């Protein structure tokens, strides 16, 4: 009669007989710590006391890492290409995946029956935006495009082509929009801005480097021609092999067609208005000069 061998039986027996780990037998692995070379001080320890001959090394004033004695260091000589030119001033866009967006909708943190912008995404703890670290919004990436099934009116700052196709395939609408740093701070934290009773400022237009992106219909830019956007939607549907649903008869049609004015920060709130949090009222300006300033 043969004995039945249990998988891992010998290993379990060895572990049972090993001593238990306690504070008394904890020690570094062999070779993890090396003893520092003992060097003499003053007249002791040999001719040069283990510090070599004169100079910076003997006097414990070693040069910084990468210093080559005054000549142009290697990392400045080769290569001389502008791969990282102005890297400290380039805008950052933290990624937001379609999988994460669907997860937030399924949990009820984000209401798909209302337009979704950065205010909803931040309040739903979906993304973290830090303008002081040059964050200019979120970038929608196509991770989870095969499981995304929500019909949304979404506003982001950048989006990949496949992510745009995944949103429009379900009958949704996506817009890429730019916010200057002050407008971005107001958008992600509206309540602290409303508390002092300041008027809502105008949103600024993007600079020369970002203007081509937000005027391109293929990127669904908020400054692009609406007719060109409709043509780009049809071309993208042909490319990925799906048909665009007719939203004109949809119950959420009014929500899906909502758009922000390029100068507006919030949905339904115009520049120059003051939100009174204490009385829960909205104060609108009546002076012609003020209206002309905020309307321009």
Curated annotation (Swiss-Prot):
GO biological processes: translation
Main location: mitochondrion
Coiled coil: none
Quaternary state and interactors: Component of the mitochondrial ribosome large subunit (39S) which comprises a 16S rRNA and about 50 distinct proteins.
Entry's Gene Ontology molecular function annotations: structural constituent of ribosome
Subcellular location: Mitochondrion
Segment annotated as transit peptide: 1-20
Record InterPro entries: Ribosomal_uL15, Ribosomal_uL15/eL18, Ribosomal_uL15/eL18_sf, Ribosomal_uL15_bac-type
Taxonomic classification: Eukaryota, Metazoa, Chordata, Craniata, Vertebrata
Protein name per the record: Large ribosomal subunit protein uL15m
One Pfam assignment: Ribosomal_L27A
Source organism of the structure: Danio rerio (Zebrafish)
Keyword Ribonucleoprotein attached: yes
């Amino acid at each position: 009669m043969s004995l039945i061998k249990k998988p891992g039986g010998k290993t379990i027996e060895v572990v049972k007989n090993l001593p238990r780990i306690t504070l008394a037998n904890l020690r570094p692995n062999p070779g993890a710590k090396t003893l520092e070379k003992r060097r003499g001080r003053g007249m002791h320890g040999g001719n040069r006391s283990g510090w070599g001959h004169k100079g910076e090394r003997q006097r414990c004033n070693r040069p910084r890492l990468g210093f080559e004695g005054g000549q142009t260091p290697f990392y400045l000589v080769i290569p001389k290409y502008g791969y990282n030119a102005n890297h400290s001033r380039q805008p950052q866009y933290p990624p937001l995946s379609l999988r994460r967006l669907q997860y937030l909708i399924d949990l009820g943190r984000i209401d798909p029956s209302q337009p979704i912008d950065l205010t909803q995404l931040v309040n739903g703890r979906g993304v973290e935006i830090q303008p002081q670290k040059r964050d200019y919004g979120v970038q929608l990436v196509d991770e989870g495009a095969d499981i995304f099934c929500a019909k949304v009116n979404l506003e982001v700052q950048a989006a990949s082509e496949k992510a745009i196709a995944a949103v429009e395939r379900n009958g949704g609408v996506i817009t890429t929009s730019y916010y200057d740093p002050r407008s971005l701070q107001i958008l992600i934290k509206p309540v602290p801005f409303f508390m002092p009773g300041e008027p809502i400022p105008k949103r600024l237009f993007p600079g020369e480097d970002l203007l081509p992106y937000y005027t391109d219909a293929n990127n669904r830019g908020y400054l692009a021609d609406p007719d060109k956007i409709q043509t780009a939607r049809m071309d993208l549907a042909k490319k990925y092999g799906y048909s665009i649903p007719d939203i004109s008869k949809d119950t959420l049609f009014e929500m899906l067609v909502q758009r922000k004015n390029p100068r507006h920060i919030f949905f339904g709130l115009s520049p120059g208005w003051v939100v009174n949090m204490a009385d829960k009222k909205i104060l609108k300006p009546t002076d012609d000069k003020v209206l002309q300033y905020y309307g321009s």
